[in-house]
Amino acid sequence: MANGDKVLGQFTQSFEEEKKASGRRLKVGIIGTGWIAEAHIESYKQMDDVDIVAAADLIPGKAEAFMKRYGVEGVHFYPSHKEMIDNEQLDAVSICTYNTQHAVPTIYALEHGVNVLLEKPFTVTLDEAVEVCRAEKKSGKILSIGFQPRVDVNMQMIKKIVESGELGKIYYIQTGGGRRRGIPNSTFIEKSTGGIGALGDIGCYSLDMVLNAIGYPKPLTVSGYKSDFFGTNPATQHPDRFHTVEENARRFSVDDFAAAFVRLEGDIILDFRIAWAMNINTPGDTIILGTKAGLRIPSTDCWNGTVGGEMTLYHDVAGVPTEEKIPILKNPDDKGLFYHKVRSFLDAVLNDLPAPVPTSQILYNQAIIDGICRSAECGHELAIEIPEI
């Protein structure tokens, strides 16, 4: 990112320059060539130190058509991630498969000395996430999870405000988001491919926004709820290129709404809710309450990776309760959040830096999602137990 400063009172947002490459070119492969891979390809194509040399997809001809559509030549194509990794000398891979197939290719890549940029959600279950983390630790390679909101300057401002101490001790957080109608198609809505629904697709973003801001405290207990009232109803479903509304309603086997009450280490309460569909425009703004001040962050429909509008800081000035508006900050260039997500991963590979979005943090995110699912199924609060890595 280009250098620059945005100032709000005592808070200054700084943008660091991208790390300069030393002339080394990275050989990159793509695993899974569905729609999310499009954002990866568009990002890689803007970089002059990357060669896209291989692509793997289970569907015959899909990877070839994908690369042709994006004008990428000289690519070797494979029917599986194993064949691609075994036959190519890759520096890194983007894993863009459907959710239930995140863990297996990630582990295989790490075990074979390849750095990994893995699309969110991390995995479907906590057990899978733990297995991936152990493979990462053993490999010594970089594994970064694809949370592009991390590079948004407004998200960074939230963290900066919390870390400044302006809010005091954080004791309560409300977060979430969603859409009145916004159920996705294809592999998202079936348990065999999506694994989890709105909870994993967009809920992981809402969790990361606040957990990253407060330093990712360990989750202790969770009481969760999830439902599928809209996804299984033809009246609130929608067709796609391959299925009618009735067919999509029959196929739907994940959650379209989830809510939870989570206790975090440090005596912090997290009140969470997320939806692909609901009969209201928002489940509520994100609220971070501290002993000195509070911060309100307008909710979004979880499409664009930033905040929903001007934030408000509630604090006392000379003993007088005061509301201070925090204007939306403009990101420093027009390359987009996805580009900077990919670039930060490659910079880590080139310069031997830590993963931009480390699994040590997202493991806690996944533990909460896993706990919500398990609690919803059994109908009562559960302890969250995270195995040693």
Locate the predicted segments by residue.
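Contiguous beta-strand/loop segments that form the cofactor/metal-binding neighborhood of enzyme cores
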Residues: 2-22, 208-306, 339-353, 370-371, ...
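Predominantly a Rossmann-like dinucleotide-binding segment in NAD(P)-dependent oxidoreductases
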Residues: 149-251, 379
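Glycine- and charged-residue-rich phosphate/anionic-cofactor binding loop of Rossmann-like
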Residues: 51-54, 326-330, 347-365
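Beta-strand-loop-alpha-helix segment that lines the small-molecule cofactor/substrate pocket
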Residues: 2, 85-87, 92, 98-151, ...
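N-terminal Rossmann-like dinucleotide-binding module
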Residues: 2-72
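C-terminal capping/lid region of NAD(P)-dependent oxidoreductase domains
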Residues: 141, 168-172, 374-389
